Amino acid sequence: MNDDEPQGRELNRRELLGTVGAAGALALGGSALAQPAGLAAPISAASPASHSAAAAPKPFELEELSVRDLSAGMAAGRWTSRRLVELYLGRIAEVDRAGAAGAGTNAIAETNPQVMEIADGLDRERAAGKLRGPLHGIPIVLKDNIDTGDRMKTTAGSLALGESVAAKDAYLVERLRAAGAVILGKTNLSEWANFRSTRSTSGWSGRGGQVRNPYVLDRNPCGSSSGTGSGISGNLAAAGIGTETAGSILCPASMCGLV
């Protein structure tokens, strides 16, 4: 990992959230399932002068909610899996894709084109009294070096693998689907999990560009699981998967306020 940081005007998370709306780690083999660490909810601040006319966003309905909270809410009929997916996709569009001054967190490489179909199927199973497991209907994101045997790409952030579609799910993904998880999308990362060079920038890849720290957008998100750390800290999914070699989960978790 490298301490190089994207340059430019300092733009912090409060400015982003004021303009556009604004993990615990559970080891799963060589990966981790991250959830928000229970930090205080972000406070919106005045937007930059160039965006002074922008309306303040509504509070995000799922702000800092845990997998347990969301599961209990679905069991009580407060949400469906489809509704959770809709809310997180809206959050991604608002905070990750656009962002203040055209710069969002850039944590998500790709969303799953089949995600609504998957969520609807899991909702039908719930209505029929069939629950696959503790993650039934929960939207989760995966680092873009983890194979999914679907229509999403698995590229390790490299343009060389830009059209690479895996033939089958990684074992980890098989287990997640068996437990009922909804694979919402893939997260950006340090290209080749930070094996691109000895002087690479944390969170940058040819495919995804630069991931930004959700607390201070021009600061280092660390890596190589940068998009997962930034995305879960920014409440872009209920939980996320990263991979660890030498700090690739621990460092983004530290920089982005996850445990």
Where are these regions (language model features)?
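N-terminal secretory signal peptides
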Residues: 1-11
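Residue-level signal for the nucleotide or nucleotide-sugar donor/cofactor binding architecture
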Residues: 11, 65, 226
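Short glycine/serine-rich loop/turn segments
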Residues: 135-259
